[in-house]
Amino acid sequence: MSVKWTSVILLIQLSFYFSSGSCGKVLVWAAEYSHWMNMKTILEELVQRGHEVTVLASSASILFDPNNSSALKIEVFPTSLTKTEFENISMQEVKRWIELPKDTFWLYFSQMQEIMWRFGDIIRNFCKDVVSNKKLMKKLQESRFDVVFADPIFPCSELLAELFNIPLVYSLRFTPGYIFEKHCGGFLFPPSYVPVVMSELSDQMTFMERVKNMIYMLSFDFYFQMYDMKKWDQFYSEVLGRPTTLSETMGKADIWLIRNSWNFQFPHPLLPNVDFVGGLHCKPAKPLPKEMEEFVQSSGENGVVVFSLGSMVTNMEEERANVIASALAQIPQKVLWRFDGKKPDTLGLNTRLYKWIPQNDLLGHPKTRAFITHGGANGIYEAIYHGVPMVGIPLFADQPDNIAHMKTKGAAVRLDFDTMSSTDLANRLKTVINDPLYKENVMKLSRIQHDQPVKPLDRAVFWIEFVMRHKGAKHLRPAAHDLTWFQYHSLDVIGFLLACVATVIFVIMKCCLFCFWKFARKGKKGKSD
């Protein structure tokens, strides 16, 4: 090949490499568990496009090992909490959340808030460890990052963005009760037709369901506004040396990338600096490991069922494990069950246990007939992407809400983990597998997920690059952030107009009384004459 053509090919390759513009520097405030999985997908794509990504993680972080090779630069800061302590606390609180008394609203709600406050205290201590580390802060300042990227459910990134005076992009699934979205992002969630997250309601609510929705909304607002947010307000004010609030600081975010989609979420208004990127981690299935593929193929026409309750549920009680195993033994399908514990006594020959499964690849296999899931958003999006109907066994957090959404859309059935029997699970599985309506409904959602002009991952990366190119996206930020609560609701305007009307009525009444008094006086004078 001539030197000329070699040069042309090299230039073309370079043009693709730099197609996103000049490469930028991204500072990431680390998240944990499924929150990190979604962020990592975006960050790896940014690295592929030539950007430099630095992840700021505590020494207690569960998912980060600085000794492992990675395209991401990991900046570890010391903290008093050890990795083991943090993981134990996380597991304890998750277990506590799963066991919350769901039949008593106020008890359930108050205990759930205590769990969230405890996590809030831990994250706040992590944040204090960062901003008080002068050597680290100087190093970060001198690195001259172009953007901060984070999940706001782990606050602190907005404080770093404020201290370094750089733009901020959020990646978020949800916050309990849409607290941060409403009070910090200015999102609109009319309670008349938008169900509060974790309420397990749909957008078609009866009067009493709207009452329940309003109570949920007010309860979340009260608990978070009156207690937890005050701690953050005080901390941020101390660090910045001026009065401020978490809402004000978070409200300066340039872009909110919400890990949701309209085939999952119920319709509601969106602001111009918000984009839905749900399912960004989904991808075509890869070939299965040889042993697993042989087991799947041995299922014949009946196919297989994939079963996973997520990575945060370990050591299932023997009684529950035996109930589930007994149910799975009653169906003709082969079952691949992600399970880490003692082998159930009732385990059937059609079921195999795995400590880990390639979930996305299994869901994308043509022989997969159903997915038994705890209702985590990542798993549900993968099931939608590949068109697999679901049996939901939600445990905590947004999982009951996610399954409620899928049930409303006719793509899933639901069971209660604590009360379901073997017969219940077997019957629900047979219903989902044998009733073609469930497959049709989930395939409709799948077609919608695939029918997008730009893939969710590409949109997410575009907005981060957009913010880096333009040094922010303030032109998309609504002016509502600059208004007080009474200005936002136009209470001052309403008060002024009411005062004007009252003044006019007062003047008219005074004029009428004056005229009446004049005529009355004139009438008396005429009689006396």
Swiss-Prot record:
It catalyses: glucuronate acceptor + UDP-alpha-D-glucuronate = acceptor beta-D-glucuronoside + UDP + H(+). InterPro entries: UDP-glycosyltransferase, UDP_glucos_trans, UDP_glycos_trans_CS. GO terms for cellular component: endoplasmic reticulum membrane. One of its GO terms (biological process) is lipid catabolic process. It is a single-pass membrane protein. Its main location: membrane. It is found in: Microsome membrane; Endoplasmic reticulum membrane. Coiled coil: none annotated. Residues 1-21 form the signal peptide. It is an enzyme of class 2 (transferase). This is UDP-glucuronosyltransferase 2B9. It comes from Macaca fascicularis (Crab-eating macaque).
